[in-house]
Amino acid sequence: MQSRYHDADVSPFLQRLGAEVPEILGLRTYTARLLGTDPALVLHGGGNTSAKGTLQSRVHGAVDVIYVKGSGSDLATIEPRGHPAVRLQPLRDLRTLPSMGDFEMVNELRTNLLDASAPTPSVETLLHAFLPARFVDHTHADAILAICDQPDGEEICRRIYGDGLVWVPYVMPGFALAQRCAEAFEAHVAAGRRPEVIVLERHGLFTFGETAKESYSRTISAVSWAEGYVAESRHTVVLSGTRSEAPCKPSLVTHALRGTLAKLGGSPCARGPIVQRRATETVLAFLDRPDAADLSAIGSATPDHVLRTKPTPLFLRLSKNDERGVRASIEAQVVEYAARYDAYFEEMCASKAVARTKLDPWPRIVLVPGVGLLAVGQTLTDASIAADIYEHTIDVIEGAADVGRYAPVSRSDLFDVEYWSLEQAKLKKSAGRPLSGAVALVTGAGSGIGKATARRLLLDGAHVVLVDRAEERLRDAVLGLDNDSRGRATWTVADVTNRTAVDAAFAHATMAFGGVDVIVSNAGTAPSGDLHSEVGERLLRESLEQNLIAHNHVARAAMTIFQEQGTGGCLLFNVSKAAVTPGPHFGPYAVAKAGLLALMRQYAVDAAPFGVRSNAVNADRVRTALFGEGVAEARAAVRGLTVDAYFKANLLEREVMDDDVAGAFAYLAGARATTGCIITVDGGNPAAFPR
């Protein structure tokens, strides 16, 4: 492992933080980010770092403090505030206590913060405080786990690190672990040995130093030694050169899994969870190992990963060329997995004589030979984190198997972390948004009504695929979203008149989110002309392709996924007032939109047996790009109106905005008992009232 600490980078980094940030905190931030941006060291909020210094208080003068990573911070992006200052001496005084409960410990941490609004310090703060070094770094490096997740981990680590090793047998994070580490460190010094690294059995690595550089460099050195040992232990494996064939289309497996989990209640929301597939060469090669199922059933590489991946994955076995039986097979194996989890929960509660609130029993990681790793989460972030963690778990498992035998923490120890009192306290239900868990695909999403609808669906909690034929518009639309919405959005370029491009857009949705639930088929054009003219007939043909046939391309592709998921779905079409009350010289548009209205109704009839709803929004006179290039002026002139008067010519005398139309689509997306319906969004037009 290469060090990424560069002396030349430090001063500019500190200058960017500003003079108000103490130098020691700036240095702490610099090396914390170096650790956090290397996934072979820590992943997604894992690990923690600290630095000890002095702060000036208006009341107490100089106060010794420890800057320690706060809960919710990610080392990769941590800011100075992510290391809140805590009074050091009161924490060290806690060593005199024989024991301390988790909530009592957290209370001590919070009451000793210098800033009451700061994040809660890490649960491993006391371990950092009890060690004498100025800087302390804690990581869960893959290579370290490969050597300490062993039956003889201590012996292996002593061969690697010699007298510099402080070995600490497994203890769950908290007060007891802090005490044990401090005692082991002091005993090492008392024996006349110089501590270099602390390895926590089946947990991870602690390094330390008087400077940020020294502590960081010790991490890199310790991990490099471990990597070298794993490499020297690697077995020679003869690969066939080809991977196992997928039992069926990977997309079918993804859709069927998502639908199964939705049906069984595997998602915290009513819709299916987000499913992300990883099919790297490393993942597929691991799944081809004859012992892959056994290895994956052993447990998490480090205890806190259980909070993201459950104790074990589901190793899914599917028959080849049995597409009809895929969903039934997946459902049976998911039910079996849940039964095993329920038994584990009951066994652990009984053996420990504790009462806990049971978490859902559904898998977060599903392994399918020939298909890959399927990670499950309530959100894309959750699924991505689980996938990242398990990809690195595979590296740890294979490294540990090369070194000796993969032997991480026991099921009993995993249960203690999974059902930790501090985690149980977080189970208060938060109010979900109307479309939480839903995946929506919106066409024509680069501007106008489509863009507004995508934004509204995201606001309501959905994950959204934005589709448009203009890449620049899509990029701008996504960049304009807030951070929360942007994390649940993806985009892809497609011309919806091209069925192959439409299929590719839906494949993108499957790769990004695992499937789709809601389709807003919005893309279209607004050609004008007389049908009895040669130009009008040509425009009619073009309009039928763009405003009718293209919508069927979208609906057909959606229906394939809806049927494979088996959980219903929602088709929404942007029709138009022109479908029921055509205007003069607007035939190419009105005829195609009338056909689209009939298309919506036909899908309402034909798709109902699959639980699929089909509805439409009839909007009128919304000032979007369709009214550009003189169209608005021409339509207003036909009626003898100014452009502004034209857009307000309705019963309410109110201009209809794209957000108004988006609100109608959002309502229909959640209207579970409504199909074959038209909602008008036109400010009121008696001639266009649905009959």
Where are each of the predicted segments found?
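Residue(s) in the substrate-gating loop at a strand-loop-helix junction
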Residues: 576
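Glycine-rich flexible loops
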Residues: 1-440, 452
